[in-house]
Amino acid sequence: YTKLPAEAIDYFESIGNYLNVVSNGKLYKCRSTIKEMLTLLPARLFIQTHRAFIVNKRKISKFNAVSVHIGELRIPVSEKYAKSVMQKGF
């Protein structure tokens, strides 16, 4: 069991009933769903970009209507969440 401060988390990726939690290049696993995690995270800090991804807004280096980037890593933005991502204007 590892406790991570929200600010240190780069993103979450849903894999069934588990989440991959990535922080500073390290991978952690947690038993939770995207929906459950969204209720626990500060909305000012995180945004859902896809049914399978939640991203730390402060870690985004660039974005457009189809993807957000954390450094060189490209994370998809689905059509459902594109408007929200573009309105936030990181």
Where are these regions (language model features)?
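Eukaryotic intrinsically disordered, low-complexity regulatory linkers and tails enriched in Ser/Thr/Pro
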Residues: 73, 77, 81-90
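Conserved binding/recognition cores within well-folded domains
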Residues: 1-70, 74-77
